[in-house]
């Protein structure tokens, strides 16, 4: 993908879908608060997205939400060869009741393009793949968050946390496993309506759910991020950082020139369906 074009230029460039076995992850930092109102291009958002942006009590949360959704629309538009405002979103059937309020999706792409969006405290993650994918990003948890939420975890995860004497290490470990858990539940389409204690997403990749690959992502010192991909480990995983200028009106940005990080994937014996990155458990 030499140049990622936005808007009308994306139409001329045509679709640029990921290859089979390829996982593309885009990390987005929110636009600077002092320039967001003037430069962030909200015209590409739906009316519902603009209302949601305006509904946040804290301006930083509204800018994070808007930055994430502008990035999502521009990225999907570039991959599909569409203007950002023309990307057709739908909801898949809920796994529990079959009503149309499940995982967000793009309507009828051929070949399929799956995506997942997550955002938290100034950072967003957009994951795109030809197979089902879920993504999550969270700010590093506070000690009280770990204490309150640990009883809801899988017994194996609770045991791993209990074995850690250092409070800082316990927070870091909880943060990594929780982002894996949310990424996996988003990929399932259930979110936290599924009991978070039902599935093991701890440090041992061989105990994680069969048929899925879980990857920790490099996300800086203040966040944890992870993706869950249906099936075996992707052949190629690439993480790119989107500069804030890419969210502004009238921009064409060569994102291959932005920070690009290849994510190493551990591949086990034939049939192994869990992968882990070199950034640890």
Report residues per predicted region.
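Core catalytic alpha/beta fold that binds nucleotide/phospho-ligands
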Residues: 1-281
């Amino acid at each position: 993908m030499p140049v990622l074009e936005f808007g009308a230029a994306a139409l001329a460039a045509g679709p640029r879908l990921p290859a089979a076995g390829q996982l593309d992850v885009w990390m987005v930092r929110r636009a600077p608060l002092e320039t967001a109102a003037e430069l962030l291009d909200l015209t590409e958002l739906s009316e519902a997205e603009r209302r949601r942006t305006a509904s946040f009590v804290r301006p930083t949360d509204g800018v994070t939400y808007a930055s994430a959704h502008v990035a999502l629309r521009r990225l999907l538009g570039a991959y599909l060869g569409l203007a950002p405002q023309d990307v057709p979103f739908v909801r898949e059937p809920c796994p529990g009741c079959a009503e149309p309020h499940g995982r967000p999706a793009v309507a009828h792409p051929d070949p399929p393009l799956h995506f997942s969006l997550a955002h938290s405290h100034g950072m967003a993650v957009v994951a795109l793949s030809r197979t089902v994918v879920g993504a999550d990003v969270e700010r590093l948890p506070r000690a009280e968050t770990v204490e309150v939420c640990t009883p809801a975890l899988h017994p194996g995860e609770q045991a791993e946390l209990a074995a850690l004497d250092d409070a800082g290490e316990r927070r870091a470990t909880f943060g990594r496993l929780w982002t894996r858990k949310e990424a996996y539940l988003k990929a399932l389409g259930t979110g936290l309506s599924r009991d978070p204690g039902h599935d093991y997403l701890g440090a041992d990749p061989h105990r994680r759910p069969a048929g899925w690959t879980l990857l920790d992502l490099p996300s800086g010192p203040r966040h944890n991020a992870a993706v869950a991909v249906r099936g075996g480990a992707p052949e190629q995983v690439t993480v790119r950082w989107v500069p804030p200028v890419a969210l502004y009106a009238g921009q064409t940005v060569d994102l291959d020139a932005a920070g690009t990080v290849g994510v190493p994937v551990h591949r086990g014996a034939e049939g192994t369906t869990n992968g882990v990155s070199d950034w640890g458990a």
